[in-house]
Amino acid sequence: MNTLFIHCRPGFEGEVCSEIADHAARLNVAGYAKAKPSTACAEFICTEDDGAQRLMQGLRFPELIFPRQWARGGFIDLPETDRISVILAYLANFPQCGSLWLEVVDTNDGKELSNFCKKFEAPLRKALTAAGKLVDDATKPRLLLTFKSGREVFVGLADAGNSAMWPMGIPRLKFPREAPSRSTLKLEEAWHHFIPRDQWDERLHGDMTGVDLGAAPGGWTWQLVNRGMLVTAVDNGPMAESLMDTGLVQHLMADGFTYKPRQPVDWMVCDIVEKPARNAALLETWIGEGHCREAVVNLKLPMRQRYAEVKRLLERIEEGFKARGIRVAIGCKQLYHDREEVTCHLRRLDLKKPKSA
């Protein structure tokens, strides 16, 4: 099991290779990363048998930026018939697993395999259970089978608590018909990723206030309003009338980069299309000067050196807060609903709850 297999957004294979190789070097795990363009996956081949396991144990999956899902294991070729026997034989030296996910890569070819996986899962699950390889136990490793085709599969393991929350790292979120744009799903997914579900009622509730910079037409504002917050929407463009009719939104025709609230708010969110360094500076200002306690801001990525640019900006933010003695939790992820961008979440850890704005 010396291969780490990683899912990602198509076109970002190089970023995954750069990121995982960076971490491997820091953890002294010898190996090399490889990927083909637009395949929605990458591999890190370890030179030592326990390398992939050490790499996974040394990293927290939610803190990785570009990987959507990962597993350690290896590829096997499958026959046209009786694939289950071949898989069972390969699993002979695997530990007993507590759950099973069948996955495909996020490409057109991968999606065509989805129906095959749905049909194949039930008989495979039955055979694994009968062989004593699969039980219902969340504390045991998850068995992940990623089908590259009907004849090739990556068979791997991942800890359920240190891997993606959803198969392939793709959330099953339903677009709310009332929301004025599909961008609303970006913010909802960000909350799922950065905020534990059992903390939503504490950190996303109706007594809170929020600011949406570059709000029009209101996709992100809708999420704040849906949690009952009073929202200041800052944009020179028009907001959806349905949002204004809620009575929870104040629309200010102003520049999102110059607006500052009169009183601190709980949340600031921003999805303005701008150079990433400028949006990162917004985070530094709003969190650093105490204008908000938590913030979600998207950073639009350059065409080249995308991982290097994100890493540089995150280090700048972290070092700046350390120098000022400000305690902040910093997270960054390329979400499924992100495109040429990543989503940053910052939470101020040394501020009391602001008074109502």
Swiss-Prot record:
Cytoplasm recorded as keyword: yes
Binding site for S-adenosyl-L-methionine: S183, A216, P217, G218, G219, D235, D255, D271
Top-level taxon of origin: Bacteria
UniProt GO cellular component terms: cytoplasm
Primary localization class, coarse: cytoplasm
The UniProt record lists the keyword Amino-acid biosynthesis: no
EC number: 2.1.1.186
One Pfam family this sequence matches: RLMM_N
InterPro entries for the chain: RlmM_FDX (IPR040739), RlmM_THUMP-like (IPR048646), RNA_MeTrfase_FtsJ_dom (IPR002877), rRNA_MeTrfase_M (IPR011224), SAM-dependent_MTases_sf (IPR029063)
Name under which the protein is recorded: Ribosomal RNA large subunit methyltransferase M
Organism (species): Pseudomonas fluorescens (strain ATCC BAA-477 / NRRL B-23932 / Pf-5)
Lineage summary: Bacteria, Pseudomonadati, Pseudomonadota, Gammaproteobacteria, Pseudomonadales
